[in-house]
Every structure is written in C-alpha cells, then in structure tokens.
Amino acid sequence: MHLLTLLLVMLFALVIAYFCYSVYFYGGRWVANPYNPRISSQKQHVIMGTLTDRDGTVLAYTDEDGQRRYNNSADTRKAVCQVVGDSGGKVSTGADTFHAQFLLGFRSSIFERLADAFTGTTQRGDDVRLTISERLSRYISEQFPKGKRGAVVVLNYKTNEILAMVSMPQFDPTNMDAALANESAGALINRATQGLYPPGSTFKIVTMASALENLPDLNDFAFDCTGYYPVGNYSVTDGSAHGVQSLSDAFAHSCNTTFAALSQDLGYEMLGQTAEEMGFNENFMFSDLIVYNSSYPIDDLSAEDLAWSAIGQGRVLATPLHMALIASTIANRGVMNEPRLIAQVTTAQGGNRALLSHAGGRRVISEDVANRLESEMIRVVKSGTGKPAA
C-alpha cells in the first residue's frame, strides 16, 4: 500500500513538473492563440508594445488612442505583413499575435505591475526588436516576379537570425477587409513557414549528404546518365542525357537519374535516417516562430518511391524555411541551429527582458561532409544549374 502511494505521488509530481516545463517553454504559444480571451481583455488595459526591425525601423505601434498602427509606407507594410501580422490576429503566426506574451505585458513581473498601479500609470507592454531587415524585405518584394506565389528566406548562418522572410502574395494590415475578401489567394499564410511543398532538387543536398556519410569509394563513382533511369514500373527522367559523370558533376548538373540510382544503393533506411537528422518528421517547437513540420516517408518504400524521394518528389514535403535551415547547416559546418526572429525585448522602463534560451545547435552531419557539400554547392552556382543566380 505504501509503495502504491509512493508511485502515485511520483506520477503526480512528474505531471506537475511536465506542466511547469510546458508553461515555461511553450506558454507563449498558449497566450498567442487568437481565440484566447485573455488577449482581448489585455488589450483593453495594456498599451501594446512597439515592433521594430533589426535597425529600429518601426513596423507596428500603438497610438495615443490605443489603436494599433503600422509603418507609414504601404510597400514596407506589405513586405513584412506575414512576419508582423495584424491587429485582429487573423495572421496568428505573425509577431503581433505570436509574441503577445511580450507586447501585451504578460511577461511583466509583479513588481512592474505594482509600480504601474501605485503611480496610476497604464501598463505598457514590452517593445520587440525583430531580426529581420525592413530594407532587405522591401528589396526582395520589389524583385519578386509580379503575380507569382512563393517565399524567400534569408538567414545569417552564423547566428541563424532571419534577416528576411517574404511571402507572396501579400496584404496590407491597414486594409484587412480587402485581405479577408480575397482570403483564397493565400496572402494571410506565411508560405515560408506554413507552406509545405515538394523540395525538388534542393533535397539532393540531403541525398548527397547521406551518400557521403554512408557509401564507400565515392571518389571513384561514375554513372552514365542516358536521360532516364528505369526503376520498378516507372522511369525517373532528366532534361537531357548528361553521359558519364562523377558524383560532383551529377550534383552540379542536378542530375535526377544519378540521384535516383544513388537512392537504390542507400536504401530507404539510410536515406530516411539522414533526412530525419536534418529535421524531417521533427516536431518543430521553436521559441521565436511557428514552423510547420516537414515530412519524409519512413515506411518501407517501393524502389520507385525511394527514387522519387531522393530528388525531393513523391511524398517529401518541406517548408522554404526548413530548406534554408539545411543550407545554413552546411555553411555552419554541419551544425543545425534553431532559427531566431527576436533580437531583443525591451521593457517599458528601458531594461532588457530575459528571453528563453534557444535550443543549442546539434550536429547533423560530419564537418568533413559539410565542407565537401559546401564546395559542391559553390560549384553549382559558379558553373552548374545555379549559375543564372550568380
């Protein structure tokens, strides 16, 4: 009986500990739910803090009448619209809603609140400085092909700060009626973090990494690309016949048939393991932003499914931000870090609010493999399929 009581007490303690852990690390997600009645209540009593870019350009602020206002430039408002969000919380992943824990003063200490009450001062939320650059975001928006949908992510690979995260189409947060009337266009969705797409040839980075990690004697690798590779009842095709080429040549030419053949040597277990080490099938719980989970099929794939997955097709899905993280990992010598969107949080009194520490970087591939991939990716841009981007 005493043993049973002890076990029940221990289980109860574990539940309480997990609850406290969840509130501390993920409480911001609960606060950020646009249906949380505490948000609307808090807005009635708290002056919402200011959002700025990394250089201090004001992106959103609260005026003297308590109304949420946005940057005076329509071009700027649209360039950062999905990152900043809107006053009504229609873009629930935007900073105005997702970081309500700071902007609406949920993180204010009891002493700060008592000081406001004692002086009769209306409580003011924290100011949040984001890592993005308004100028860079606006430049990307101006260069983006008109009428096209897509996303662009720019990361500082050393710090994993998000310097720009632009999604098309866009909306103006000062005219939400128009945005909601055209909601089917998808402007309220941040395609960089919420859009799940077949990564295509960018996934060849993962396949190449898996091959370099697991297959021997790749220095002598040669494959004769005839323009198609029969596998099962299907053929993986290429735009042209590349002829006999090394692995480096195949990567530079983005040769589908070579990577389809590599997949058969790797098998679904080895390729799937590398994909998962690089974040596929992971439940992303980042501190600064919501990112939808990428997926790679890990069940017993058929030969043709495996071949298509090796070139980023089939059932492989990823967000643009995740693929940018993978590229950043290569530049960072094989270590993947959590993306950062918050640069600083400042209290109403001018002090720095303590932020949750970001998860430490984890090694996903060896440094030697990362260095080799970096060289190969540079070659792609200098003389391969990426040359037009140079």
Q: For each predicted feature, which ranges?
A:
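Periplasmic/cell-envelope proteins involved in peptidoglycan metabolism and beta-lactam response
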Residues: 1-180, 187, 196, 221, ...
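Beta-lactam-recognizing serine transpeptidase/beta-lactamase-like catalytic domain environment
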Residues: 55, 115-116, 158-201, 206-390
